[in-house]
Design a protein with these regions (language model features):
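Flavin-dependent oxidoreductase catalytic cores
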Residues: 4-5, 9-375
Length: 375
């Protein structure tokens, strides 16, 4: 239970945290409290970077968190196109059968589950020395292609430098490839819905991942329908949610992982808290417009932070970043939408509870805290 020791202003800690334990809704999906386990490595239900399978270790961790009164679980990021062996997630049907058998056990906890689906990394894909060798040696690249097609995995909106390696540049994705991903999101979401999952989260117009790269002017230099204007840059993300709603129904909840501001000066150069700089990516003015635009396209929730892989420490804030480092920006964007907004990034429960009580955010995202203590 929550400690009864005195908190701020003479109220008990239990009273101070009460806003975290109030119900809310994402579309028609009611969540019992405002505590959200956000996605992180090791919480995948359908495997990761390996032959796809129902991941019993990930399921065990998620179930333990759910049993300890977490309201909404966002399971680990699942690529709709698995980088290893080039497998489309919707083609591996058995793991969805295993997931369906597990879901009643999860739902007994009273928690709700959204599975996070990603289009991938684009220029942010982490490149190891072995991958550099595979890519730069043409013979090895051909031999490795069936299980590690770096050319496809790292494809981006436009030719651009990889975040980590100068030896593996990104090529431009084709329109046909974009359409393949959109179709895959719909098919995968339908399989998850049929397995009993409560919703999905799209990864991501966030942190400079592939979908986000399409929205960012400093990465996206396309001249077709997926580049140039505001509407074109956000088209990929919009067409994904529309496809999911078409296949799964308008009432099936779809969240979006969303970075309010990029906090980025350019390729491989991020901004620090309080620094004066020229934003190369999404600034607040564009974000105000984008948040509503994405809501109107069909997204039912925004799961928010800041940053790109060029400014990674906003989305994965280490100890030297301020606590609640994304809260002010996320609370600001909340004014421009009618859908619920979750804030993540070194959140402390007391500050989160106060922000929820004041209507500044709707839910609080925690991840590493649950690794330390599932209770």
């Amino acid at each position: 239970g929550v400690s009864k020791r005195e908190g701020k202003g003479g109220v008990t800690m239990k009273q101070q945290l009460e806003p975290l334990f109030t119900p809310w809704k994402i579309g028609n999906c009611e969540i019992k409290n405002r505590i959200v386990l956000t996605s992180m490595g090791g919480t995948n239900l359908l495997g990761w970077m390996e032959v796809n399978h129902f991941d019993k270790d990930g399921a065990k961790f998620i179930l333990e968190v759910a049993k300890n009164n977490c309201g909404l679980v966002l399971s680990g990021c699942q690529p709709v196109y698995n980088p290893m062996y080039g497998q489309w997630l919707y083609k591996k049907k058995k793991m969805y059968e295993d997931l369906a058998k597990w879901m009643p056990k999860f739902h007994k906890t009273g928690a709700k589950l959204f599975v996070q689906l990603t289009a991938g990394f684009g220029r942010s894909f982490t490149i190891s020395e072995m991958m550099e060798t595979l890519y730069t040696n043409k013979a090895l690249r051909v031999l490795a292609k069936p299980f590690m097609d770096l050319d496809k995995i790292t494809a981006a909106p436009s030719p651009s430098p990889n975040r980590w390696s100068d030896k593996v540049p990104s090529r431009e994705m084709t329109v046909e490839e974009i359409q393949e991903f959109i179709t895959a999101f719909g098919k995968t979401a339908k399989l998850l819905k049929d397995a009993g999952v409560d919703g999905v989260e799209i990864h991501a117009v966030h942190e400079g991942y592939l979908l986000d790269q399409f929205t960012l002017k400093y990465v996206n230099q396309r001249t077709d329908e997926y580049g140039g204007s505001f509407e074109n840059r956000y088209r990929f993300a919009v067409e994904i949610v529309k496809e999911i709603k078409k296949v799964c129904g308008q009432d099936f909840p779809v969240s979006l992982r969303y970075s309010v501001e990029s906090k980025t000066k350019g390729f491989r150069e991020g901004a620090l808290p309080g620094e004066s700089f020229t934003e190369a990516g999404r600034d607040m003015a564009e974000s105000e417009k984008a948040a509503k635009y994405l809501q109107d396209a069909g997204y039912d929730m925004l799961n928010c932070d800041n940053g790109t892989y060029d400014a990674w420490y906003w989305a994965h804030p280490p100890i030297y970043m301020p606590e609640n480092c994304n809260l002010e920006d996320v609370a600001h964007i909340r004014k421009f939408v009618d859908i619920p907004v979750v804030c993540a990034g070194r959140m402390d429960p007391e500050t989160a509870a106060a922000a929820i009580a004041d209507g500044r955010i709707d839910g609080a995202g925690f991840a590493r805290q649950f690794l330390a203590d599932q209770e």
